[in-house]
Amino acid sequence: PQTAPADADPETLRAYFAKGINHVPLTDERGHLVALAMDEQDVLRIGKHTISEDSPAFIIAEIGNNHQGSVDFAKELVDLAVESGADAVKFQLRDMDALYRQRGAATAGEDLGVQYTLDLLSRFSLSVDQMYEVFDHVKQHDMDIMCTPWDAPSVQALVDYGIQGMKIASADLTNHELLRDVASRGLPMLVSTGMSREEEIRESVALLRNAGASYALLQCQSAYPAPFKDVNLAYMDRLAEIGQCLVGYSGHERGYHVPIAAVARGAKIIEKHFTTDKTLEGNDHTVSLLPEEFKAMVQQIREVEAAIGSAAPREVSTGELMNRVNLAKSLVATRHIAKGEVVTEADVAVKSPGRGLQPNHLPQLVGRTMQRDVEEGSFFFEGDLKDDLVTRRDFKFDRPWGLPVRYHDYKPLIEEAKPDFLEFH
């Protein structure tokens, strides 16, 4: 791994970060690790996507186990997710023997909900080889792949394949052994925070930071479906503060308006379950989106992102310019003012349209000596606030020339400029 001296200056470290290295070991003169420098820029790189505060939201179609244990159905869902505009698809991988403490007849002693879950998983889980086959199909679409490992063997299987990123389920937020295992692999991590208390979130964040993990936290309400009153998108702000990282939203509510609102509140990662039939057997189908719903969500998220814009100084948009002319007001002369006369307040009125000098310039106009004749009802212009008058010049061209014009101003332009042609807008 690349290292830097313990006394490396910020510029040296920034050069590492500019190369896409998020964590740089700092060593003393004996080569011993003494600290870890981390890129404080909120950037997460998953596959071909770089996720940051300035990037579009990274939208994940969570297929999970909605493939019903069928490789062909899983591939179909991938194809539909691609058509729906997802940036990535995500699956779940479990080693049932490593994950559950009891199997077979011994599960009779478990809670009914656990028995139901075990039954579904035993019927609908894909093997490692089957999952690899589905991953290969995803690669044909040049789409990013993520997966949730539920146990150590699954982590290793995903690493062996070359997975681009891993998701930690809410149920494993306090599974520090799994967190350390995934963090040690150097892969980007998305960590859901459902079913957790804040002190548990803080504890896991401390573990991830100490491990040098590259991660984002997802606000999540782990109920199926999640009541809207419990979603609490505002908590994303607190997660960003706790994690000092990018935040996102993993939704289990019905519909897709909440993820759109999450993006408006700053979520840079969105995860929603994906299915073709909400009546299929399994916990996730009822809170999943159909392909046409997912596509609508993606489109509306992109529209909202475009509408959010930036906090840069405001400028008049192209669409506003015409309305500014048509609806705004200008300073106009109430009488004929001859060149050399001093403009008084009585000489000026405020009238539409907004083709001339704006009304807020009235104080600068009053008291000025006119450098030109102004007819009654004519506009004043910015040039009337300057001492040097722009003089007319006649140009000659050796080819036909024209002007882009609007309907309301083409007549005076024809009379004054005499172009060979006009282009109407």
Question: What kind of feature is each model-predicted range?
Answer:
Residues 1, 7-13, 116, 197, ...:
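Short, structural beta-strand-to-alpha-helix junction motif
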Residues 1, 14, 18, 414-422:
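Compositionally biased, intrinsically disordered low-complexity regions enriched
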Residues 2-22, 26-28:
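The conserved cystathionine-beta-synthase
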Residues 34-39:
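Short hydrophobic beta-strand motif reused across regulatory alpha/beta modules
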Residues 40-425:
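Catalytic cores and adjacent flexible loops of soluble metabolic enzymes
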